[in-house]
């Protein structure tokens, strides 16, 4: 018995990798320091790391940072206690996005709706509810069926009352529902995908990380790759993401990297996940404004056959993005630098953080 009590915490620590214990904190006052950030978040548990990201040249706060707890339960407790206010300012905590995910369009968008793929014919709404309600309060569940045959099309949507359950579910990746492997990802509406595309196209350079010509491709020094934002220096509140220790940033934008796979100009569910073909030109055929992402054709592992016909929504062009997601450096930041016109959050340049 004594051995069991000793080994369980060790096993739990092994299971809970850093990516499950880290929070991105956006909207920080420029007066907030590591000390005040740490003091605030320690009320929910022990922090193993805490950092306020700063401009490498001026050392001025860039208005966001990261805190890492010792357990995922502490992260859950902190997120359950929102809103958070530090130094007189309401901040925006969000589960940090891991490096391998931060390059995907839409990875940093905050949504309450979850896409669930791999739904078998014997899976009913109550199976989804029983599984997902442990993550948060569910508003609606939809399992999409074929209008003519009435058969399940293999996917559905779960809408929560908050974005955090979606972030947590997507972060954990592997899910088994009613004995079947399921694929989960954020469900982006047509409008949200258009916003992602707009941010990825660079808007004249803003949000664009250049063309991967310099710094070994670390975000590139392309003209205008300055991520210059509004008064808070966040790129008008979109896409904070530095990538501390390889973690992408906060809400909005989805502006990292140039990986294809997200639906074309008409929206879609993107994701770069191969194997989901489409029926009628995409998931739902524009169902509820969630047009068909570019899931390819054929089978997705054991998620069932979705190869009726390939999507007619092509992959989104990567615009002026180099596609490199090399986030080198001790803070996973790659070459941040002050950027073209700098602002208070300029990417690009050659200075290492």
Curated annotation (Swiss-Prot):
<dbReference type="GO" id="GO:0006406">
    <property type="term" value="P:mRNA export from nucleus"/>
</dbReference>
<keyword id="KW-0813">Transport</keyword>
<dbReference type="InterPro" id="IPR021662">
    <property type="entry name" value="HnRNPA1/A2_C"/>
</dbReference>
<feature type="cross-link" description="Glycyl lysine isopeptide (Lys-Gly) (interchain with G-Cter in SUMO2)">
    <location>
        <position position="112"/>
    </location>
</feature>
<keyword id="KW-0677">Repeat</keyword>
<feature type="modified residue" description="Phosphoserine">
    <location>
        <position position="29"/>
    </location>
</feature>
<feature type="modified residue" description="Phosphotyrosine">
    <location>
        <position position="331"/>
    </location>
</feature>
<dbReference type="GO" id="GO:0005634">
    <property type="term" value="C:nucleus"/>
</dbReference>
<keyword id="KW-0507">mRNA processing</keyword>
<feature type="modified residue" description="N6,N6-dimethyllysine; alternate">
    <location>
        <position position="104"/>
    </location>
</feature>
<keyword id="KW-0539">Nucleus</keyword>
<feature type="cross-link" description="Glycyl lysine isopeptide (Lys-Gly) (interchain with G-Cter in SUMO2)">
    <location>
        <position position="152"/>
    </location>
</feature>
<keyword id="KW-1017">Isopeptide bond</keyword>
<feature type="modified residue" description="Phosphoserine">
    <location>
        <position position="259"/>
    </location>
</feature>
<feature type="modified residue" description="Phosphoserine">
    <location>
        <position position="201"/>
    </location>
</feature>
<feature type="modified residue" description="Phosphothreonine">
    <location>
        <position position="159"/>
    </location>
</feature>
<keyword id="KW-0964">Secreted</keyword>
<dbReference type="InterPro" id="IPR012677">
    <property type="entry name" value="Nucleotide-bd_a/b_plait_sf"/>
</dbReference>
<feature type="modified residue" description="Phosphoserine">
    <location>
        <position position="189"/>
    </location>
</feature>
<keyword id="KW-0007">Acetylation</keyword>
<feature type="modified residue" description="Phosphoserine">
    <location>
        <position position="344"/>
    </location>
</feature>
<feature type="region of interest" description="Disordered">
    <location>
        <begin position="193"/>
        <end position="353"/>
    </location>
</feature>
<feature type="modified residue" description="Omega-N-methylarginine; alternate">
    <location>
        <position position="213"/>
    </location>
</feature>
<dbReference type="GO" id="GO:1990247">
    <property type="term" value="F:N6-methyladenosine-containing RNA reader activity"/>
</dbReference>
<dbReference type="Pfam" id="PF11627">
    <property type="entry name" value="HnRNPA1_LC"/>
</dbReference>
<feature type="modified residue" description="Omega-N-methylarginine; alternate">
    <location>
        <position position="203"/>
    </location>
</feature>
<feature type="domain" description="RRM 1">
    <location>
        <begin position="21"/>
        <end position="104"/>
    </location>
</feature>
<comment type="function">
    <text>Heterogeneous nuclear ribonucleoprotein (hnRNP) that associates with nascent pre-mRNAs, packaging them into hnRNP particles. The hnRNP particle arrangement on nascent hnRNA is non-random and sequence-dependent and serves to condense and stabilize the transcripts and minimize tangling and knotting. Packaging plays a role in various processes such as transcription, pre-mRNA processing, RNA nuclear export, subcellular location, mRNA translation and stability of mature mRNAs. Forms hnRNP particles with at least 20 other different hnRNP and heterogeneous nuclear RNA in the nucleus.</text>
</comment>
<keyword id="KW-0747">Spliceosome</keyword>
<feature type="compositionally biased region" description="Gly residues">
    <location>
        <begin position="320"/>
        <end position="353"/>
    </location>
</feature>
<feature type="modified residue" description="Asymmetric dimethylarginine; alternate">
    <location>
        <position position="266"/>
    </location>
</feature>
<feature type="cross-link" description="Glycyl lysine isopeptide (Lys-Gly) (interchain with G-Cter in SUMO2); alternate">
    <location>
        <position position="168"/>
    </location>
</feature>
<dbReference type="InterPro" id="IPR035979">
    <property type="entry name" value="RBD_domain_sf"/>
</dbReference>
<feature type="modified residue" description="Phosphoserine">
    <location>
        <position position="85"/>
    </location>
</feature>
<feature type="modified residue" description="Omega-N-methylarginine">
    <location>
        <position position="38"/>
    </location>
</feature>
<keyword id="KW-0509">mRNA transport</keyword>
<feature type="modified residue" description="Omega-N-methylarginine">
    <location>
        <position position="350"/>
    </location>
</feature>
<dbReference type="GO" id="GO:0043047">
    <property type="term" value="F:single-stranded telomeric DNA binding"/>
</dbReference>
<keyword id="KW-0508">mRNA splicing</keyword>
<dbReference type="Pfam" id="PF00076">
    <property type="entry name" value="RRM_1"/>
</dbReference>
<dbReference type="GO" id="GO:0000398">
    <property type="term" value="P:mRNA splicing, via spliceosome"/>
</dbReference>
<feature type="modified residue" description="Phosphoserine">
    <location>
        <position position="149"/>
    </location>
</feature>
């Amino acid at each position: 018995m004594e051995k069991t009590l000793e080994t369980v915490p060790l096993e739990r620590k092994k299971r809970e990798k850093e990516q499950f214990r880290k929070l991105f904190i956006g909207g920080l006052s420029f007066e907030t320091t590591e000390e005040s950030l740490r003091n605030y978040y320690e009320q929910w548990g022990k922090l193993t790391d805490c950092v306020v990201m700063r401009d490498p040249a001026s050392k001025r706060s860039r208005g966001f940072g990261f805190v890492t707890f010792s357990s995922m339960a502490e992260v859950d407790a902190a997120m359950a206690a929102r809103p958070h206010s530090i130094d007189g300012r309401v901040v925006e905590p969000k589960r940090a996005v891991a490096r391998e995910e931060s390059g995907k369009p839409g990875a940093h968008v905050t949504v309450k709706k979850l896409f669930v793929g791999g739904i078998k014919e014997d899976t009913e709404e109550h199976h989804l509810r029983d599984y997902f309600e442990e993550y948060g309060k569910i508003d609606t569940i939809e399992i999409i069926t074929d209008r003519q045959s009435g058969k399940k099309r293999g996917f559905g949507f779960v809408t929560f009352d908050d974005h955090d359950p979606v972030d947590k579910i997507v972060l954990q990746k592997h899910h088994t529902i009613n004995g079947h492997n399921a694929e989960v990802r954020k469900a982006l509406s047509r409008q949200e995908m258009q916003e992602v595309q707009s941010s990825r196209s660079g808007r004249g350079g803003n949000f664009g990380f250049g063309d991967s010509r310099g710094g070994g491709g670390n975000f590139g020094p392309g003209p205008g790759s300055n991520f210059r934002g509004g008064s808070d220096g966040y790129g008008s509140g979109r896409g904070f993401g530095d990538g501390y220790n390889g973690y992408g940033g906060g809400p909005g934008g989805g502006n990292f990297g140039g990986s294809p796979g997200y639906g074309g100009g008409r929206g879609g569910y993107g994701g770069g996940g191969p194997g989901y073909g489409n029926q009628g030109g995409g998931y739902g055929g524009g169902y509820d404004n969630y047009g068909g992402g570019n899931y390819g054709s054929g089978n997705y592992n054991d998620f069932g056959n979705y190869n009726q016909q390939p999507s007619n929504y092509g992959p989104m062009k990567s615009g002026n993005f180099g596609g490199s997601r090399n986030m080198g450096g001790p803070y996973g930041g790659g070459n941040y630098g002050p950027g073209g016109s700098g602002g208070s959050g300029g990417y690009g340049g050659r200075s290492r953080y």
